Amino acid sequence: MVHVMVKVKYPPHIQEEFLKFYLSGKAPAYPPYVKRIYQWVYSDYNTKVINIYEIPDDKLIEGMKGIGKRFASYTKFKGHKYKVILMMEGSEAIKLFK
């Protein structure tokens, strides 16, 4: 499995409209093999969300496209930003440096 983190932030003045869209189910669905395993929300001034996904190794490219398509649908909200980050476990990273 591959892990992908998506960091999202948006300003408070769009929160109500953003949440209506988020809860409406109108955003493109994730591919069935993309599993969100964590979602954390916190706030400083902006609302910030951290999502962690699992994607099978052999579906990585298609999974990343699916995640990108979903999050791109939120960019119509002024101030909404997201970043997709491919991650690996520490033990996998150490192997790269041996």
Task: List PLM regions with ranges.
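Short, intrinsically disordered, mixed-charge
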Residues: 27, 69-73
